[in-house]
UniProtKB/Swiss-Prot annotation:
The keyword Amino-acid biosynthesis does not apply. This is Pantothenate synthetase. (R)-pantoate binds at residue 59. It is found in: Cytoplasm. The reaction proceeds by a bi uni uni bi ping pong mechanism. ATP binds at residues 28-35, 145-148, 174, 182-185. It comes from the Bacteria. The keyword Transmembrane does not apply. Catalyzes the condensation of pantoate with beta-alanine in an ATP-dependent reaction via a pantoyl-adenylate intermediate. Homodimer.
């Protein structure tokens, strides 16, 4: 396994694979079983698998956890080697965004909804780094997890709109035995908070069932759901149901749909979603 840290090196190490299919797994590090499942899925689709590890400053707003985001490069590289990764790419912020870098991306109004409503730089900052990563690696395909479904949907839109010929694959959400969607930020939680967070997946399934049973009661179901989350000790960022294919609001509930939530528990922001098909 090769470990490279700048664009010249990553291009040099990948040059012999010009005629092979290159698959990119973009991450911010602090790898867990969810990331490794993306690696294993990508190995089914690509001849060469490259994992990028980069805590992207563009997607963090002032006061967020950029500085304290967990970084454990040595352990991450060991996990990648065990998973059969071919190349690990660990660029620096200075290398990705040198002095004078000023380009931005605005993918449109949906970047300011759901996670983008409260995290003003989040979606568009991710889009910049994903464009750079696929251009730097000449990837043929990339994989993102279903847990970040808004990002997955908008990345596909971006690549389609700009004629970027990279397939964006969807990896399944990996959950703990109790149903909690895995996240690197779980390191911020105490054991008691982890136990409390285990409530969320079952709650989402319950909301989904209520919507299926009463499609005309959408507003009331969501309002009750927010109240329930608050009663359970969560600070609610959003609880919403959207059209699965467009992410638009629905005046009348219909399938396929997706229920999204984002909540705060202590200092940790947790997101999840479920498909209603």
């Amino acid at each position: 396994m090769e470990i490279v840290r700048d664009v010249e090196s990553v291009r040099a190490v990948l040059r012999p694979f010009t005629n092979r299919k290159i698959g990119l797994v973009p991450t911010m590090g602090a790898l867990h079983s969810g990331h490794l499942s993306l690696v294993h899925e990508m190995k089914k689709h690509a001849d060469v698998v490259i994992v990028s590890i980069f805590v992207n400053p563009l997607q963090f707003s002032p006061g967020e956890d950029y500085e304290k985001y967990p970084r454990c490069e040595e352990v991450d590289c060991e996990k990648c080697a065990s998973a059969g990764v071919d190349v690990v790419y660990i660029p620096s912020a200075e290398g990705m965004y040198p002095d004078g870098f000023s380009t931005s991306v605005d993918i449109g109004p949906m970047a300011r909804e759901l996670c983008g409503a409260s995290r003003q730089n989040f979606i568009n900052g991710i889009m910049v780094v994903l464009i750079k990563l696929v251009m730097q690696t000449n990837a043929h395909c990339m994989i993102l997890g279903e847990k970040d479904y808004q990002m997955l949907h908008l990345t596909r839109q971006l690549f389609r709109d700009l004629n970027i010929g990279v397939d964006v694959l969807q990896g399944n959400t990996v959950r703990s035995a109790e149903g909690l969607a895995l996240s690197s930020r779980h390191q911020y939680l105490s054991s008691a908070e982890i136990t409390k967070a285990n409530f969320l997946y079952g709650f989402l399934l319950e909301v989904g069932q209520q919507l299926s049973d009463d499609p005309h009661g959408q507003q009331e179901i969501i309002a009750r759901g927010k109240l329930r989350l608050e009663q359970e000790g969560f600070e609610v960022d959003y609880l919403e149901v959207r059209d699965n294919n467009t992410l638009e609001h629905m005046q009348t509930f219909r399938k396929p749909a997706r229920v999204f939530l984002a909540v705060y528990l202590g200092n940790c922001r947790l997101i999840d979603n479920v498909l209603l098909a």
